[in-house]
Amino acid sequence: MTAATLVTLALSLSLAQHDAAPAPAPAAVEQHGAAPEAAASADPHAAPAGEHGAAVEAHAAAAGEHGEAAGHEGGHDESLGAVMLHHVTDGYVIEHPGFCNGAFAWNCEWDLRATFGDALKFGKLDLTPTKHVIMMWLASALLLVVVLAAVRKKSLVPRGLYNFIELLVAFVRNEIAVKNIGEKDADRFTPYLVTAFFFILFLNLFGLLPFSATATANLSVTVAMALFTFFITQYAAIRAMGMGGYVAHLTGGVPKSLAPLWLIMVPVEFLGLFTKPFALTVRLFANMLAGHFVILALLGLIFALGTPWVAFGSVPMALSIFLLELFVAFVQAYIFTMLSSLFIGAGLVHHGDDHGHAEEHGHAGPGMGSEHGSHVAGASPGHG
């Protein structure tokens, strides 16, 4: 029961009591000897009752308007919060401009569930794509188009957009992969790093376009991408060190003579394996989500305060944050790619470290300490 209904009932009861109070009025008329008037006393009192009924309706209408106004004002902040959440959360409806209901509108809706129906439902497993999945499909398609067009270019000297794309590819290879992984192994992991860089970049840029969505503000998307880096990192480490060396690395380099410390080092090293993908996940997700919330909050000041004059301050501020988000789109793609290359390179570097530890601690016989020490010292630059 709404507040407007309660107010209407209260007014009706009070007015009903007020109607019952002036009952002696006909007797007063009869005492004055106005018989003809007494005969017609029902009609004059019917008119006040009608007036009271009109008053009740007026009060009810006023109460209803008051309730609606209060509900509108109370739900204004909720509607602003709902708009903000709707902008960043995933769903099955994509808004777009177009012709719907026989006329052009800016808020036409594409219901993905209605489009795909039950074609992608397998029991309790629902594979119907959401709007973030659609954005990832578009980013993948754009990535294929750009790469294939750049590969098939006829001119040896790239121009325009292809020059910019080639510049970014060379930057990822030379400044990220080579410096963090090494010249020897960089080319093996450059394709993944380039793909991750452009995929994240396109998703970030799509989120700045009207009627689109920011898939990188979805925790599930960033978790999946961080897991790709995690599995590639573990694969690189196992391939470089072997399974035995990989497991031995979990001891943190503590020698067998201090084996009791393994009870501390092994859990710490094991947890350290998962802190890296966690950092990748939260960093990308939080940065992209926060930027959109700030823009929407600044624009929402116009509606929250109820005056258009706020637009002179909030719109320029929102535009400034938008330009900053354009820069952040490139920065977050770079940071994710750089951290991924650092983690991969760390797994490869551990191979040289463990090899040095094995030579120092595992195979030196009695009387060979000084000779072996000089051998390791002389070989260490080669390992670097």
From Swiss-Prot:
- Topological category with respect to the lipid bilayer: Multi-pass membrane protein
The Gene Ontology CC terms held by the record are: plasma membrane; proton-transporting ATP synthase complex
* Protein localization: Cell inner membrane
Top-level taxon in the UniProt lineage: Bacteria
MF terms in GO = proton-transporting ATP synthase activity, rotational mechanism
NCBIfam families linked: ATP_synt_6_or_A (TIGR01131), PRK13419.1 (NF009953)
Keyword match Ion transport: yes
Q: What is this protein called?
A: ATP synthase subunit a
* Ion transport listed as a keyword: yes
Q: Which residues cross the membrane?
A: 131-151, 193-213, 218-238, 258-278, 293-313, 319-339
Region Disordered: what ranges?
23-76, 355-384
Q: Where is the composition biased (Low complexity)?
A: 23-64
Quote the function comment for this protein. Key component of the proton channel; it plays a direct role in the translocation of protons across the membrane.
- Binding partners and assembly: F-type ATPases have 2 components, CF(1) - the catalytic core - and CF(0) - the membrane proton channel. CF(1) has five subunits: alpha(3), beta(3), gamma(1), delta(1), epsilon(1). CF(0) has three main subunits: a(1), b(2) and c(9-12). The alpha and beta chains form an alternating ring which encloses part of the gamma chain. CF(1) is attached to CF(0) by a central stalk formed by the gamma and epsilon chains, while a peripheral stalk is formed by the delta and b chains.
Q: Which family does it belong to?
A: Belongs to the ATPase A chain family.
Q: Where is the composition biased (Basic and acidic residues)?
A: 65-76
Q: Which organism is it from?
A: Anaeromyxobacter sp. (strain K)
